Amino acid sequence: MARLRPERLRAALDEQLIALGRADEAPPPDARLEDALVAAVLAAYDAGEEPVRTALRVTARVLLERLATDFPGRSVEVRVPPYAAVQCVEGPRHTRGTPPNVIETDAKTWIMLATGRTTWDEARDRISASGERADLSARLPVRPYGAQP
């Protein structure tokens, strides 16, 4: 998965801040855009609102990228349809077809898991997981919210 360009991150952040009525906030430097976007999406959820679609998509992708960066490998595929999927976690890798370890969940559940707002056990009924390695509880939340490689 290619790294998101700052322009895409900034556009998603701006759109979410406008939806939150915080359009006049000073934009963060490029190095902080990802964290600012995650915070804006969480603020929407905290306010009882749905994040704007672009911000939701980009945030899900940012958090999946962090998981894959911190726990590289190809033994587990994590899917957040329709937004993104990554392969991560060292171990036996697959080369064709569906991987033996697949985790799939919706974007809100993924964001809440990745940021430590909910635990794997609390979200179990909203996660489809198959395979002996399809449990990310020891790897969540992602940095800077918790788990470190």
Task: List each language-model region with its residue ranges.
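A structural signal for well-ordered alpha-helices, especially hydrophobic packing surfaces
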Residues: 17, 41-45, 68
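Short coil/turn segments at secondary-structure boundaries
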Residues: 51-55, 66, 97-101
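Amphipathic protein-protein interaction modules
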Residues: 75-93, 97-109
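Negatively charged, low-complexity tracts enriched in Asp/Glu with abundant Ser/Thr
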Residues: 39-58
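Short leucine-rich amphipathic alpha-helical surface patches
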Residues: 71, 82, 114-118
